[in-house]
Amino acid sequence: MKHKLLLSLFATLSLTAHADEGMWMLTDLKQQNAAVMQDLGLDISIDQVYCPDNINLKDAVVHFGGGCTGEVISSEGLVLTNHHCGYGYIQQHSSVEHDYLTDGFWAMTREQELPCKGLNVTFIDRILDVTEYVQKQLKKSKDPDGTNYLSPSFLAKVAEKFAKKERIRTNEFTTLELKPFYGANKYYLFVKTSYKDVRMVGAPPSSIGKFGADTDNWMWPRHCGDFSIFRIYASKDGKPANYSAENVPLKVKKHIAINLKGVKEGDFTFVMGFPGRNWRYMISDEVEERMQTTNFMRDTIRGVRLRVLGEEMAKDARTRIQYAAKYASSANYWKNAIGMNEGLVRLKVLDRKKREQEQLLAFGDSIGNDNYRKAYESIKQIVAQRHDAVYHQQAIYEALMLGTEFFKVPDTDALRMALEGQKQKDIDEAVAALKEAGKKFFNKDYNPEVDRKVSKQLIALYARLIPADQRIDIFQTIEKDFQGNTDAFVDACFNQSIFRSPEALDEFLKQPDAQQLENDLMVRYAASVRNGYQATSDAMQEETNAYNAAHKTWVEGVLQMKKANGQPIYPDANSTLRLTYGKIGSYEPADGKEYLYYTTLKGVMEKEDPNNPEFVVPAKLKELYEKKDFGPYAMPDGRMPVCFATATDNTGGNSGSPVFNAKGELIGTGFDRNYEGLTGDIAYNPQLQRAACVDIRYTLFIIDKFAGASHLLKEMTIIR
């Protein structure tokens, strides 16, 4: 009786998932979620959402570029995603003469669609629970360190072996991905098909796609048209292929119908996408560690980098275009780190985590299992032991690896060894390879003088953050040869290195010298940074292995407790395809303040500030607003919708995700979360967490009325 009472108590406490909480595995929907989704308003069968044996909505959702989500919206391979997901490719095609970032881009014919070098979109063909098979392979394997259960190389071999057994064919375009879930208590195999000829079709100007920019980022209310459009191309027989002028638009097996009827408070929605990372199974000590290391370093270091980049980008158009994507990428998680730390304190997440820990420990005691308590104590001890190493590693990563671009100078070891070996054939091959690597380093988006200015600030900041006796070994040179003056060291790098300019590299390669390579300051700096980062990893290796084992046991405990209580479960995000659901809704961020669930074009006009580049409104958009020329995209009361908020459980990687209504029709595109919900990566809060979405009516309004690209709408299935 005592055991039953305890389980009943645990079921009522805060580990219970809220109706809106969860990044659910598609394979679990029918068993775990279908009834709840239908109670909340889902108006189609769960098999229309996902079914392994039939074509369904899953088949119209793509992993876009490996870091975002996209959705197929026409039978000829049109893919809709966010403007910020396509931003790097818009920037790739931009120049001072063709400034697509500022002016936007619209292909009025198929011939005008622009190939995007390096862009892939990936469909998920099959999702297989291979837990039992992997566990059998683990038992057979020789694993003296006991780490194969998380080893990517080992799991890749297991995936290949399983595919051979099941006769799953793979090639350059159809690949396997086997990943651990729930701390490696379960394993799933994903069979994926990637298309590598993807072309840019349309993007609004940044004054629409990035309206509000950094000021509004991670905020609600929002007023940006954060979308861009691409097209998948394939060979003439419909197979994935590398870029070729002979390729044709892909005839897809599934595309999503678009609904223009709009949204209202309380409407059921669901989202499919590829959420990147979250950490819902952390204990409180890990949350504190995250606040004091990763988030602290992002806030401190990126803030300095962004200030310098902003100053340089304001000076001329060329620099602005060169650094637009880098700036946006850095700023995104700079603000995220600030908001997360503020929210973790404001919402008392540490207290909540401590209560949840006590529930699980009590559950373990109630069933006579002390493994969960041992795992908890082990994690606490490990987090304390590794604190300084994590702190230092994050400083190296943020300041020196991400912050200083000259860290990425090409590897010169092959040439140095060839020179020492004195074999001309080896030397010629190494010279040719370094020449090619140099071309990639000196790409059109690299500005050495900007890098010099940023590097001076960040290397000095690293020195202030890390005690002298712990710094990476290049600081011995800085102390000895530059009297500790980091600015002088950076100047010497940019004045003397063979990588100071393309011309300097070419001149060196005419008569390469091993000693000069060995003494080159940029080369030595890059090696020191790499070695310093690796040293922090090596210093934590024992703790990392012990942590992984303890975390696996801890998560197993959570699963067992939820199973005992009949509660649904979901794993942490790991860039695999998931589904989340919730209702459209307003919310109250603070006493006396309410944010409505929607925004309109009126709000864009109210925010306009011609003196602030983040809030410039295009003249054509103002003209359409003043004339109320909204076409069929207006709300019933005549206003033009822009964005809406829904209580789905999103995180980074969900950017570009399709937002479906109860009938599985597209009503919007997810692009962000609200500031009050940034703690959601660690702890979900149903009252405050919202996903910001571009209303599909605004997307089509911009395509049709603003851009005049109505030919694209003719490809789409639109329900009016």
Where do the model's predicted regions map?
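Terminal presequence/propeptide segments associated with secretion/organelle targeting
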Residues: 2, 16-720
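Sec-dependent N-terminal signal peptides
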Residues: 4-13
